C-alpha cells in the first residue's frame, strides 16, 4: 500500500500555456531524490480542472514514464459526470498508474446515495486501486465517514483522502472502515496530528517545495514521535497558510518558479498568477522554512 509523504504535484507550463514536460521530468527527479513516497499527477494541484481529457491522460502517462518504476504515481480520475470519470479511468488504466484518486463530483452536489453509486460505477470500470477524495471546500459536497463506509466492501476502493481538516474524522473512519482502509490527509496544517491519530499518509501541496522536511515530519508522526514531528513541522507552518493566500495552486507554482524548480509560473485561466500583495508573505514563509530562492 502507498503511505507516507505524497506530493500533489503541480503541472508546469510554458508561457504559452502548453505543458512544460522538461520541467515535469525535473520535478519527478527532484521528488525521487528528496525521498517523497509517491506522486499524485493531475489532481487539484495539478490543474485537473483546466486540462482536457487527452492532455490530462498524457501528463499522467509522461509522469509514469519519467518515474520509471522508482516512485508510485497516482493518477487523478475525478469528474462531476460519472460517465466522464469512467472514460478517464479506463484511459488511465492503460498508462501504468499505481492507483487513482477520484474527487467527489463537484457542483452538481450528489446525495450520499449518488456518491456511493458514482464510486461503485467508477471502480467497476478498472482493476486499479481507487482512492476516494473528500474536499467539500471545493466541491460543495461533504462525503461523511458513514458514506465512505458503504464503499469499503468494494475490493479496489482502498482508501480516502480526507481534506476537511477535521482530524476527529480519523477515529470515526477507523471505527467504520477498519484498520486496512487507507486514510490520507489532504490538509497540510493538520497532517501531523492526522498521522499521529492513525492516518497512513498525506497528499500534500507544501510537499512540492519542502519535500525532504515534509517526508521527515511524516516519518516521525507515523513512528508515533509527536515531539520530533512537531519540531520539524513548526518552521513549515507559515507555508501551510500562505500557500493558500490565493487559490491553490497559484501560490505553490509561484514559489516553485522562484526556487528554480520550474521554468515558468504560468497557470491556466480562470486562475491567474499570484498577486503582488502575496509575494512578500510567501517569501517570508519560504525564508522561515529555509527555502532558497533564486
Curated annotation (Swiss-Prot):
Pyruvate binds at residues 45, 203. InterPro entries: Aldolase_TIM, DapA, DapA-like, Schiff_base-form_aldolases_AS, Schiff_base-form_aldolases_CS. The record marks 44, 107 as: Part of a proton relay during catalysis. It comes from the Bacteria. Its EC number is 4.3.3.7. It is found in: Cytoplasm. GO terms for cellular component: cytosol. The active site is at 133 (proton donor/acceptor), 161 (schiff-base intermediate with substrate). It catalyses: L-aspartate 4-semialdehyde + pyruvate = (2S,4S)-4-hydroxy-2,3,4,5-tetrahydrodipicolinate + H2O + H(+). Keywords: Amino-acid biosynthesis, Cytoplasm, Diaminopimelate biosynthesis, Lyase, Lysine biosynthesis, Schiff base. Its main location: cytoplasm. GO terms for molecular function: 4-hydroxy-tetrahydrodipicolinate synthase activity. One of its GO terms (biological process) is lysine biosynthetic process via diaminopimelate. Pathway: Amino-acid biosynthesis; L-lysine biosynthesis via DAP pathway; (S)-tetrahydrodipicolinate from L-aspartate: step 3/4. Belongs to the DapA family. Catalyzes the condensation of (S)-aspartate-beta-semialdehyde [(S)-ASA] and pyruvate to 4-hydroxy-tetrahydrodipicolinate (HTPA). Homotetramer; dimer of dimers. This is 4-hydroxy-tetrahydrodipicolinate synthase. The gene is dapA.
Amino acid at each position: 500500500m502507498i503511505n507516507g509523504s505524497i506530493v500533489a504535484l503541480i503541472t508546469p507550463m510554458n508561457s504559452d500555456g502548453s505543458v512544460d514536460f522538461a520541467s515535469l521530468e525535473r520535478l519527478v527527479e527532484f521528488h525521487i531524490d528528496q525521498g517523497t513516497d509517491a506522486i499524485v499527477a493531475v489532481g487539484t494541484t495539478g490543474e485537473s480542472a483546466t486540462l482536457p481529457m487527452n492532455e490530462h491522460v498524457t501528463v499522467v502517462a509522461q509522469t509514469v514514464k519519467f518515474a520509471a518504476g522508482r516512485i508510485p504515481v497516482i493518477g487523478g480520475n475525478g469528474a462531476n459526470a460519472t460517465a466522464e470519470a469512467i472514460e478517464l479511468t479506463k484511459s488511465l488504466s492503460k498508462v501504468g498508474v499505481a492507483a487513482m484518486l477520484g474527487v467527489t463530483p463537484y457542483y452538481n452536489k450528489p446525495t450520499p446515495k449518488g456518491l456511493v453509486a458514482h464510486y461503485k460505477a467508477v471502480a467497476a470500470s478498472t482493476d486499479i486501486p481507487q482512492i476516494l477524495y473528500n474536499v467539500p471546500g471545493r466541491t460543495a459536497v461533504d462525503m461523511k465517514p458513514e458514506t465512505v463506509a458503504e464503499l469499503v466492501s468494494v475490493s479496489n476502493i482502498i482508501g480516502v483522502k480526507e481534506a476537511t481538516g477535521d482530524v476527529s474524522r480519523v477515529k470515526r473512519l477507523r471505527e467504520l472502515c477498519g484498520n486496512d482502509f487507507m486514510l490520507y490527509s489532504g490538509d497540510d496544517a493538520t497532517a501531523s496530528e492526522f498521522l499521529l491519530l492513525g492516518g497512513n499518509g498525506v497528499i500534500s501541496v507544501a510537499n512540492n517545495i519542502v519535500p525532504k522536511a515534509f517526508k521527515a515530519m511524516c516519518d516521525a508522526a507515523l513512528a508515533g514521535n509527536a515531539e520530533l514531528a512537531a519540531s520539524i513541522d513548526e518552521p513549515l507552518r507559515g507555508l501551510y497558510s500562505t500557500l493558500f493566500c490565493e487559490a491553490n495552486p497559484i501560490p505553490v507554482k509561484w514559489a516553485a518558479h522562484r526556487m528554480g524548480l520550474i521554468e515558468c509560473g504560468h497557470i491556466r485561466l480562470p486562475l491567474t498568477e499570484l498577486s503582488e500583495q502575496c509575494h512578500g508573505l510567501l517569501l517570508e514563509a519560504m525564508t522561515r522554512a529555509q527555502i532558497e530562492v533564486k
